[in-house]
From Swiss-Prot:
Classification via Pfam families: SLX9
Record-linked PANTHER family: PROTEIN FAM207A, RIBOSOME BIOGENESIS PROTEIN SLX9 HOMOLOG
Record protein name field: Ribosome biogenesis protein SLX9 homolog
GO biological process terms held by the UniProt record: maturation of SSU-rRNA from tricistronic rRNA transcript (SSU-rRNA, 5.8S rRNA, LSU-rRNA)
CC terms in the record's Gene Ontology section: 90S preribosome; nucleolus; preribosome, small subunit precursor
Lineage: Eukaryota, Metazoa, Chordata, Craniata, Vertebrata
Family stated for the protein in its record: Belongs to the SLX9 family.
Compartments, record wording: Nucleus, Nucleolus
PTM sites of type Phosphothreonine: T34
Biased composition (Pro residues): 25-38
Biased composition (Basic residues): 1-11
Disordered as annotated region, ranges: 1-42, 155-187
Keywords: Nucleus, Phosphoprotein
Length: 230
């Protein structure tokens, strides 16, 4: 590219000068002034400007340093751990993705099943909504559908009653837990055992074979206690 000239330089011509007169230009550089003779203060300044480490002796072996793991700062260690964890996470994800890859037919089959389930759920919801609108439109005397929907299920009530009965039975002291019984309960237990023993002595099975009768009675009593605990 050429030199960019201003509008004045392009339109006006240069001034005519007489012979021997030089055209105006940049002024010649002024001759450097010679520094004055150095005094005592100048000598001190020159001494200060010289290399201050000229007489310093440094062992080259001290300049060689090794970056070891123990000498590294905590920040650098944390950065290294963060980088390694960040690099390991994508690899784990890639491994999980590689494990869950399914063939195209299986994907289409799963997608079709999901769509069928959604369609079935939508159909059931629409049918229920339609029945509710029909029930509201036609007033039926003795319609028990709202009451049936509001009441809890019978199975849930039965399960709750069974849990309450079991908790009550567990709260009652067993015959083996005499320390939890009161004096009246212990007296009642003794009366029951005495009555049961008298019935056993009066039974014909005891007269025929006492050991067999006692074993059968004890087994029956243990079964009753186990059933009460359950």
């Amino acid at each position: 590219m050429g030199k960019v000239r201003g509008l004045r330089a392009r339109v006006h011509q240069a001034a005519v000068r007489p012979k021997g007169e030089a055209a105006p230009g940049p002024a010649p550089p002024a001759p450097e002034a010679t520094p004055p003779p150095a005094s005592a203060a100048g000598k001190d300044w020159a001494f200060i400007n010289t290399n201050i480490f000229a007489r310093t002796k440094i062992d080259p072996s001290a300049l060689v340093q090794k970056l070891e793991l123990d000498v590294r700062s905590v920040t650098s260690v944390r950065r290294g751990e963060a980088g390694s964890s960040a690099r390991s996470v994508p690899s784990i994800r890639r491994g999980a993705e590689a494990k869950t890859v399914l063939p195209k037919k299986e994907k289409m089959k799963l997608r079709r099943e999901q769509w069928l389930q959604k369609i079935e759920a939508i159909k059931l919801a629409e049918q229920k909504h339609r029945e509710e609108r029909r029930r509201r439109a036609t007033v039926v005397v003795g319609d028990l559908h709202p009451l049936r929907d509001a009441l809890p299920e019978l199975l849930g009530l039965e399960a709750g009653s069974r849990r309450q009965a079991r908790s009550r039975e567990s709260n009652k002291p067993r015959p083996s837990e005499l320390s939890r019984m009161s004096a009246a309960q212990r007296q009642q237990l003794l009366e029951e055992e005495r009555t049961r023993f008298q019935e056993l002595l009066a039974s014909p099975a005891y007269r025929a074979s006492p050991l067999v009768a006692i074993g059968q009675t004890l087994a029956r009593q243990m079964q009753l206690e186990d059933g009460g605990q359950l």
